[in-house]
C-alpha cells in the first residue's frame, strides 16, 4: 500500500507539488505536472464539492489530509444539486475539485467549459471507456445499475431482464427508485442515448403511469425491498453489498439481478474534475492523484464495494466481472445532457 507525503519543491522561484511515494509503488509513477505557464503555490488547503455520501467519503478525505498535510473543506450534496450550483457559480466558484457520483454531471460541467484538463500521467492510469476521452474528468470507481428484488415475493426468473418490461401493468405499484438521484438520472440519459429520445420518453411515460414508489435515495429504496414493502427497486449494486457486509448475505431478504448490456444495467463511474479556476493548482492535482492511487482504490473496494478502475486492484468478492456488464455502445462522455433528462422526468411528474 502506498504512503504519501506532501513536499513543496522550489526551483527558480517556481513552486510545484510533488507526492513522494514510498514502499511498494510501481515503477514509472510520476509527480503531478507543474502548470505550464505560471505555477501556483500550494496553500495547503483544498475546497471540494462532493456529490457523494459524507459517511462514505469523509474517512478517505481525513486519510488524504493525514498523508499529505492538505486540509480539505468539503461541501456535500447530491451530484445534480452541486452540478447546478457549479453552473450557477461559473468561473466564480470557490470549488477546486468536484467529486461526482456519476459521469453525467461531470460531462455537463465540461460542456460548459468549467473544468480544466486532467494531466495525462493521471488520466492514462484509468482504462479508456471509464474516463473522459478529452481528459476533462477522470473516472475513480465503477458501479452497476441493478434490479433489487424481494425474494419472498418474486423469483429470480420473474425479475425482468430489461427495464423496458417494468412498464408492464403487472408491475404497477411494485417498482421503486429515487428520481432525483444522479445515478438514476444517468440511467435515463443512457436510455436516451442508446434507444433514442422517442423510446426513452415512452419509457418514462410508461413507468410514471405504473404508480412507481418514489424515494429520496438508493439506500432507502433498497430498505423497502429488504423490509417487504417493495417488490423491485432500481439501485446501484454496492448498496446491497454494504448492507450484506453488516448483517450477512444470508440475512438479506433482497437479492440483485444484473442486466448485462441493458440500459437499466449500465456501468457508470464516480469521477472527479478540476474546476477551471483551479487549473494547475497543486493541491487539486494532489487530490486527483490520491483518488486513483492504490491506497484510495483499495479503500473504495473495502468500504464502498465499488469496482476499482486502477488496473491490478481486485474487485469486491462476489461481483461479476466489470467487463461482462459494459455496453460497448455506450460512451460515458455522451451522458452530459443532464438538464434534458431532468426536464423529461419533470414533464411526467417524476421530479
Where in the sequence are the language-model features?
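Secretory targeting and sorting signals
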Residues: 1-28
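A ligand-binding cleft/hinge motif common to bilobed small-molecule-binding domains
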Residues: 104-108, 231-253
Amino acid at each position: 500500500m502506498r504512503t504519501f507525503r506532501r513536499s513543496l519543491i522550489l526551483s527558480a522561484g517556481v513552486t510545484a507539488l510533488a507526492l513522494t511515494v514510498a514502499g511498494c509503488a510501481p515503477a514509472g509513477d510520476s509527480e503531478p505536472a507543474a502548470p505550464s505557464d505560471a505555477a501556483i503555490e500550494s496553500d495547503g488547503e483544498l475546497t471540494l464539492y462532493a456529490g457523494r455520501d459524507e459517511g462514505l467519503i469523509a474517512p478517505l478525505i481525513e486519510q488524504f489530509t493525514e498523508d499529505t498535510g492538505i486540509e480539505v473543506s468539503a461541501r456535500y450534496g447530491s451530484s445534480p444539486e452541486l452540478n447546478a450550483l457549479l453552473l450557477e457559480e461559473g468561473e466564480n466558484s470557490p470549488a477546486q475539485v468536484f467529486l461526482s457520483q456519476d459521469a453525467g454531471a461531470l460531462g455537463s460541467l465540461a460542456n460548459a467549459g468549467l473544468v480544466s484538463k486532467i494531466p495525462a500521467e493521471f488520466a492514462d492510469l484509468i482504462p479508456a471507456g471509464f474516463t473522459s476521452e478529452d481528459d476533462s474528468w477522470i473516472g475513480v470507481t465503477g458501479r452497476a445499475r441493478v434490479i433489487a428484488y424481494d425474494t419472498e415475493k418474486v423469483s429470480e426468473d420473474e425479475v425482468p431482464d430489461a427495464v423496458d418490461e417494468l412498464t408492464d401493468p403487472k408491475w404497477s405499484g411494485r417498482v421503486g427508485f429515487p428520481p432525483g438521484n444522479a445515478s438514476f438520472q444517468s440511467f435515463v440519459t443512457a436510455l436516451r442515448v442508446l434507444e433514442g429520445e422517442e423510446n426513452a420518453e415512452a419509457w418514462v411515460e410508461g413507468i410514471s403511469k405504473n404508480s412507481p414508489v418514489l424515494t429520496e435515495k438508493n439506500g432507502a429504496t433498497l430498505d423497502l425491498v429488504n423490509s417487504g414493502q417493495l417488490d423491485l427497486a432500481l439501485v446501484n449494486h454496492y448498496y446491497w453489498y454494504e448492507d450484506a457486509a453488516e448483517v450477512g448475505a444470508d440475512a438479506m431478504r433482497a437479492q440483485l439481478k444484473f442486466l448485462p448490456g441493458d440500459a437499466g444495467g449500465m456501468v457508470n463511474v464516480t469521477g472527479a474534475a478540476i474546476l477551471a479556476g483551479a487549473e494547475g493548482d497543486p493541491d487539486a492535482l494532489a487530490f486527483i492523484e490520491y483518488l486513483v492511487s492504490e491506497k484510495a482504490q483499495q479503500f473504495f473496494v473495502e468500504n464502498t464495494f465499488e469496482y476499482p478502475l486502477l488496473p491490478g486492484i481486485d474487485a469486491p468478492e462476489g461481483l461479476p466481472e466489470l467487463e461482462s456488464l459494459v455496453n460497448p455502445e455506450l460512451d460515458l462522455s455522451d451522458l452530459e445532457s443532464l438538464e434534458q433528462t431532468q426536464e423529461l422526468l419533470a414533464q411526467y411528474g417524476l421530479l
